Amino acid sequence: MPQENIKSKEIILSIDAGTQSIRAALIDTDGNILHIVKTPIQPYYSEHPGWAEQQPDYYWEMLCKTTGQLLQKQEHLKANIAGVTLTTQRATMINVDKDGKALRPAITWLDQRKADSCKILPGALRPVLKTVKLLDTVESAIQDCEANWICQQQPDIWEKTHKFLHLSGFFTHRLTGEFIDSVGNNIGYLPFNNKTYQWAGKYDFKWWLFKIEQEKLPAMIKPSEILGQITKKASLETGIPAGLPVFAAGSDKGCEILGSGCLTPETGCLSFGTIATFDVATPKYVELRPMIPPYPASVPDTYYTEVSIFRGFWMVSWFKEEFGLQECILAEKNNDVPEKLFDSLIQNVPAGSMGLMLQPYWTPGIGADSYAKGSIIGFGDVHNRAYLYRALLEGLIYGLREGGELTQRKTKVPVTKLKVSGGGSQSEAAMQITADIFGMAAERPHTFETSALGAAIDAAVGLKLYSDFPSAVRSMTRTGKVFEPSLKNHQLYDNLYKRVYLKMYGQLKPLFKEIKDITGYPK
């Protein structure tokens, strides 16, 4: 077990490259964040409508800047670093040559371009797939596969591609010189067998759906195993001591789940990030929807089932930009962040927002109808922007409750505990609304940096500082604040959820389709 004297403890350098920032943290074996540096990044740029790209070298420069600043400030702790670990945003894809040099901009997970499915999916097969209600799922997967688009639109780039990597794989090569990645990062439109945690077999239909040659894919290892060692070149650029082992972890969402202490399906893990998600960890392969598999966890031989709201707590940023000028001005004056002031904005708004109901489908999620749209109903003369903001939070959490109920039906395991992480969990109002809508206590971890912490847990197990994941989680995670539900508010929310929210999409769905047919939006 780890020693008690903090000066003699091993320290883990955890790098967390998210959508809006890159963090580097020094974390001890008790799960304490000893020091952290956060560098905001530009999530993407868009040269065409619907595109969302970023230069891979920009990501690397921001990573080097972040680790460099951290280790300059904490030079005295360098000798205590026992290992390095890495977690990144999901499904951001990069084409590289034999030297690991990017051949084109990264296509981020926010990108909405579509490949031509007609060039891949035979017309004769469409009626069959439609009969078994899988046509939309298969067609969407083909269209959303970044590799398919590149093959069709930039065949010269695809021909030059040596490896097609996640951002995590790109960083791993820059750090270690190896084309290798963690199974826990393998999320996206790739020929991967989620049941076996390996690339698909030779005759698997996924090779037909996703036009990727196997030799262009990296080697894969399990979370907590060693990816490689920091090279001398990487050391010069990042400030990380050469020779340190780099341990496989998982995606940023996956590491959030682990860092929140979720290891079994009885615990529901809510992530209040750009994407809002409801996940459970399970040893069993369970598809919540046909042909949409659970994804590999940050723990070996485990799956995460996930329901996501694509525009999750991004909605808070949307509200800030469109309706939050007053809070933005006040926050700048007081050197604060506007989001904190929104809690005060709604303190006098009653639970249920006097019937103002929001369904947060600003962008359709996985498995949703392509023409799905967000909606707000129930306006009256009492409603103002404060009511709108509370309705926004309530709508997001109604959506997560719906996801939680689907999860429990499919896993056949009741959720008895809620853990909430992500930037939005810093909102006291959002946490209380969560407890009230779900009707059970909502726990916030001891740190908001659960993604970096989850990656550090992988490294701690890999370093043999703990014998297994349960013991590492017991020692490195703990509950911060617990929000208990109000019975009165829960009864109100339960009625609004069952009698209104769950009926909204079905009632409005035909109108959403008409809107798309008339306006052509979304394409």
Language-model features and meaning:
Residues 27-28, 94-97, 150-152, 173-174, ...:
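Short beta-strand-to-turn element immediately C-terminal to the catalytic PLP-Schiff-base lysine
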